[in-house]
């Protein structure tokens, strides 16, 4: 497999796309609270991406071969939903855990990020799981360097999760 090294200009465009994705999460953060629906959060993000950023919400209508198009602009995974939850009219309530996953396209480059939100007070177990996941993410990121293998990243993440009695989702 040949790995093509991007040019400095391409890397700059990647950074811009990533910054825009992060800005969507910063924009939506004050709106994430009990009483709002994930559908409303999606609508706010959609409008912000299109009208303020002039970015394209990558998930909207994305369909890999054999699948139905994704109907929303962001993914909202509530509580036990692992990933790629579809925003809907369910009202968020105190104690919910919500992950918002944002992917934007700007000048042909994708920026993809997510953030975990706690709605009000969540259980100690939910806080512990989120903390272990956060730590595992950084341990994986720390493995990224010239000559590293993808398996090194996965191993660091999996070893940390398993040391706390958790496992890593293999298929979703």
Question: For each of these PLM feature ranges, what is it?
Answer:
Residues 1-172:
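Active-site neighborhoods and metal-handling regions in enzymes and metal-associated proteins
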């Amino acid at each position: 497999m040949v790995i093509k090294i991007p040019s400095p200009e391409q890397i700059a465009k990647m950074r811009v796309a990533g910054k825009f994705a992060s800005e969507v999460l910063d924009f939506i953060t004050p709106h994430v609270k009990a009483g709002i629906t994930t559908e409303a959060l999606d609508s706010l993000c959609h409008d912000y991406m299109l009208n303020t950023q002039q970015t394209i919400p990558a998930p909207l209508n994305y369909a890999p071969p054999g699948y139905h198009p994704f109907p929303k602009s962001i993914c909202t995974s509530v509580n036990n939903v692992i990933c790629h939850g579809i925003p809907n009219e369910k009202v968020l309530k105190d104690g919910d855990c919500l992950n918002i996953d944002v992917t934007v396209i700007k000048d042909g480059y994708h920026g993809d990020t997510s953030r975990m939100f706690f709605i009000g007070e969540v259980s100690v177990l939910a806080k512990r799981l989120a903390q272990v996941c956060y730590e595992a993410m950084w341990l994986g990121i720390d493995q990224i360097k010239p000559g590293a293998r993808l398996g090194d990243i996965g191993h660091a993440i999996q070893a940390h999760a398993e040391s706390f009695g958790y496992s890593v989702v293999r298929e979703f």
